[in-house]
Amino acid sequence: MDVNPTLLFLKVPAQNAISTTFPYTGDPPYSHGTGTGYTMDTVNRTHQYSEKGKWTTNTETGAPQLNPIDGPLPEDNEPSGYAQTDCVLEAMAFLEESHPGIFENSCLETIEVVQQTRVDKLTQGRQTYDWTLNRNQPAATALANTIEVFRSNGLTANESGRLIDFLKDVMESMDKEEIEITTHFQRKRRVRDNMTKKMVTQRTIGKKKQRVNKRSYLIRALTLNTMTKDAERGKLKRRAIATPGMQIRGFVYFVETLARSICEKLEQSGLPVGGNEKKAKLANVVRKMMTNSQDTELSFTITGDNTKWNENQNPRMFLAMITYITKNQPEWFRNILSIAPIMFSNKMARLGKGYMFESKRMKLRTQIPAEMLASIDLKYFNESTRKKIEKIRPLLIDGTASLSPGMMMGMFNMLSTVLGVSILNLGQKKYTKTTYWWDGLQSSDDFALIVNAPNHEGIQAGVDRFYRTCKLVGINMSKKKSYINKTGTFEFTSFFYRYGFVANFSMELPSFGVSGINESADMSIGVTVIKNNMINNDLGPATAQMALQLFIKDYRYTYRCHRGDTQIQTRRSFELKKLWDQTQSKAGLLVSDGGPNLYNIRNLHIPEVCLKWELMDEDYQGRLCNPLNPFVSHKEIESVNNAVVMPAHGPAKSMEYDAVATTHSWIPKRNRSILNTSQRGILEDEQMYQKCCNLFEKFFPSSSYRRPVGISSMVEAMVSRARIDARIDFESGRIKKEEFSEIMKICSTIEELRRQK
């Protein structure tokens, strides 16, 4: 049946139809090839906005650096990064005046966190620049490699397991004249295969030691690797994002902890909360402004957009902010927090893989690595690339570009929010000392500004003053992209406000559908997404019911598990029909085994196995939930799992769903081809690391809450825990005497082996 789309809108208020204009159906665009060009764009753009600053040379690395701080005040509307130190400090002082004790309390909270955080905090997060191998790695591997190198260079403070001690090692590593690292390389040789008698290439992975001098080490420690941001909708051009290395990460974490603690106490901050909590917070600010604008006052709201937020932020400003926020705090604490901005003032951007060249005529392809861009003849490049390279050349050192001004994407979201809020805070009448006043919301680079005044001229004057105040701290409100409306209608972080927040349902569209993890998880995730959208996003009962039917249909086509009594022929239909015929209670079969769907919008919260358990044949129950079933490699299933769902904007969200372990919870095996590459050594390291961590979790399940504290190795901690548990179990009669003595014997053997090592 064809539906005339205009009919859909007859009964819908205009603001609810906003979601249909979003570019959120279909696949998002992904980037291909290298991000080198995008990174050069970022570096060049950042320098352009600060071009009237002062040039200096870093004495350690020889990198040229541009410092725009306290530079000339802009005379036009072009974006610029010339923040004025005294203005930033004053904004901080006024923020503290309006919120007495806010900085002090946040510092105390952060000091506590700093003293307690374990180094394994750094294993969170995805790709991390691994300076030992000069490329990206999973965070856990990159951390393990860093610690291994530190250890072999005599830096062992980190073995206490505290993050702060690891950071001491980082500081000491920067003073060393040289550092020895282990890198992976691969050898290829031609050998004759015994079976086929053909010649084959055999690859072996070697590890080799390499010495790095102080300058090279510093460059690596200060390097941010860059990648292209994928899956970004509604944009024509891609852009680069940065992944910092392990040396920077810990310091950034502490700064962001402090800033997060401050943001939590600021009513104008859209971070760190999200979802419904964020909506409630925002609605409060709007309510305050609307109730205060009595009948005599006008109230307008700007849906704001800042031009090139990251490129105009400056680490030197962040240093000034931190210095102010942490005044009167212990010296060690002030030092540890000031290191992140200092490192960012000296950061280097790695240009990525370089350029690919191909000659159609000679069928040749060759890669020009980023390291060669400094010296290669530019005649091979097209006009625009040539300009980029010419501009960036003076900044290049070893394939990285010196990038002192600017903050790469997503590094100091919380701290930059504090800066934004400090300007919103200046809108109170006691500061504007006139008839207009403002307030608003800030979340990283996104803002909404509410201005109240007795007449239109006052509104205009208020907006102008806000605009100019922002310029003083390096924030550039875009006059082209911001728009003003009567208060009551605006957009902030993709939430649409119209006398209350309107559900922007289209943003959730990408997360509907079959995830492709396995039959068990996919069913659970699918119904949970529908349930969550009924709770949070105005998904009505009729639409939800339809979404559910579409999901089941999609699910059956994905796993070829149509009902046992259907006429549809697939590869699985023969087996499923057989199962259907020999099952007495057909309602008990899971959908993935050709059973009927028993879900409706009232029971979405119940896992399918539980929903059908009473209806199942006994032998089916036995097969389905049998951990000894030889056809299933089981992962241990927690009662709640996390799935990654892709909402339409922002990062992938983690969503909890109920996981019931059945024979359908299989895990696909790793692709074999990786085992023949240079990644193999790394993969083995990673699996070892994983195994150790899993074992450790067994001894100290997160339910026991307290992490082992104190200076002991993982092995020692596990042995002592095993002894304590064994004694308790023995005394309470849960284990026999023989078992108890065997456990004690194993513990002693382990300790003996450690001593011999």
UniProtKB/Swiss-Prot annotation:
Chief subcellular location: host cell
Sequence ranges assigned to domain RdRp catalytic in this UniProt record: 286-483
UniProt feature, compositional bias: Polar residues: 55-64
Record key words, sorted: Eukaryotic host gene expression shutoff by virus, Eukaryotic host transcription shutoff by virus, Host cytoplasm, Host gene expression shutoff by virus, Host nucleus, Host-virus interaction, Inhibition of host RNA polymerase II by virus, Nucleotide-binding, Nucleotidyltransferase, Phosphoprotein, RNA-directed RNA polymerase, Transferase, Viral RNA replication, Viral transcription
PTM per Swiss-Prot/TrEMBL: Phosphorylated by host PRKCA.
GO MF term set: nucleotide binding; RNA binding; RNA-directed RNA polymerase activity
Entry GO CC: host cell cytoplasm; host cell nucleus
Catalysis performed (reactions): RNA(n) + a ribonucleoside 5'-triphosphate = RNA(n+1) + diphosphate
Coiled-coil region list: none
InterPro entries referenced in this protein's UniProt entry, alphabetically: RNA-dir_pol_NSvirus, RNA_pol_PB1_influenza
Segments of this protein annotated with the region Disordered: 50-82
EC number from the UniProt entry: 2.7.7.48
Physiological role: RNA-dependent RNA polymerase which is responsible for replication and transcription of virus RNA segments. The transcription of viral mRNAs occurs by a unique mechanism called cap-snatching. 5' methylated caps of cellular mRNAs are cleaved after 10-13 nucleotides by PA. In turn, these short capped RNAs are used as primers by PB1 for transcription of viral mRNAs. During virus replication, PB1 initiates RNA synthesis and copy vRNA into complementary RNA (cRNA) which in turn serves as a template for the production of more vRNAs.
Similarity field: Belongs to the influenza viruses polymerase PB1 family.
HAMAP family linked: INFV_RDRP (MF_04065)
Descriptive protein name: RNA-directed RNA polymerase catalytic subunit
Lineage: Viruses, Riboviria, Orthornavirae, Negarnaviricota, Polyploviricotina
